[in-house]
Amino acid sequence: MSRILAVHASPRGERSQSRRLAEVFLAAYREAHPQARVARREVGRVPLPAVTEAFVAAAFHPQPEQRSLAMQADLALSDQLVGELFDSDLLVISTPMYNFSVPSGLKAWIDQIVRLGVTFDFVLDNGVAQYRPLLRGKRALIVTSRGGHGFGPGGENQAMNHADPWLRTALGFIGIDEVTVVAAEGEESGGRSFEDSCDEAEQRLLALARSA
């Protein structure tokens, strides 16, 4: 049975194009795979807290088994979020591009799930850290909407895209290196160009859902 974790990052509800497109994929996936289980984590409309000094102290405690009750409480939400990730086979992230990057809620989610000794580890080689991801056998689908055009590979604005490339880096760091990106561009200008981009994204998502 497939297990999907859907993380929605847009602060908008029905007006969110990234959310709508991700739900197109999820509905088609459930239709093709009736036994699939979908869990949703809302980080756009219900933002997660930013990490604090207490969180950092607890997360990087040299002896995790000796964390105080207060430290354990500081990591409780992170532990829950990491558990949701470990319990999934496929991660679906829907996010708009905001100011060339992702909404703060999604950045906070990444900060909560990239955990030393939990989702990544490292060894020192002559004083240099060699990082090792701890997640295995997971895939990710990033569904994104962009206000302008040309932010994809080979586009004239590719260098300004710090959204899905950054997500690829963060996910790969913890072991999710099979990542597919589906984007709709031109939301701000709208019109036929944006409609065509959405239609193309929908068709690709439907094909991915049925072939997964």
Curated annotation (Swiss-Prot):
Manner of cofactor binding, per the entry note: Binds 1 FMN per subunit.
Record-listed substrate binding positions: 99, 131, 188
SUPFAM superfamilies xref list: Flavoproteins (SSF52218)
Protein's recorded name: FMN-dependent NAD(P)H:quinone oxidoreductase 1
Enzyme kind, highest EC tier: oxidoreductase
Family annotation (Pfam families): Flavodoxin_2
Cofactor(s) annotated in UniProt: FMN
InterPro entries assigned: Flavodoxin_fold, Flavoprotein-like_sf, FMN-dep_NADH:Q_OxRdtase_AzoR1, NADH:quinone_OxRdtase_FMN_depd
Description of activity control: Azoreductase activity increases with salt strength.
Role of this protein: Quinone reductase that provides resistance to thiol-specific stress caused by electrophilic quinones. Shows a preference for benzoquinones.
Record keywords, A-Z: Flavoprotein, FMN, NAD, Oxidoreductase
Site description Important in the architecture of the active site, residues in chain: 131
Source species of the chain: Pseudomonas aeruginosa (strain ATCC 15692 / DSM 22644 / CIP 104116 / JCM 14847 / LMG 12228 / 1C / PRS 101 / PAO1)
Single GO MF descriptor: oxidoreductase activity, acting on NAD(P)H, quinone or similar compound as acceptor
Further details from the record: Rate of quinone reduction is higher than reduction of azo substrates, suggesting the enzyme is better suited for carrying out quinone rather than azo reduction.
EC numbers: 1.6.5.-, 1.7.1.17
Annotated catalysed reactions: 2 a quinone + NADPH + H(+) = 2 a 1,4-benzosemiquinone + NADP(+); 2 a quinone + NADH + H(+) = 2 a 1,4-benzosemiquinone + NAD(+); N,N-dimethyl-1,4-phenylenediamine + anthranilate + 2 NAD(+) = 2-(4-dimethylaminophenyl)diazenylbenzoate + 2 NADH + 2 H(+)
Gene: azoR1
Keyword Acetylation carried by entry: no
Subunit structure: Homodimer. Homotetramer formed by a dimer of dimers when the ionic strength is high.
Binding site residues for FMN: 10, 16-18, 97-100, 145-148, 187
Entry similarity comment: Belongs to the azoreductase type 1 family.
Protein biosynthesis recorded as keyword: no
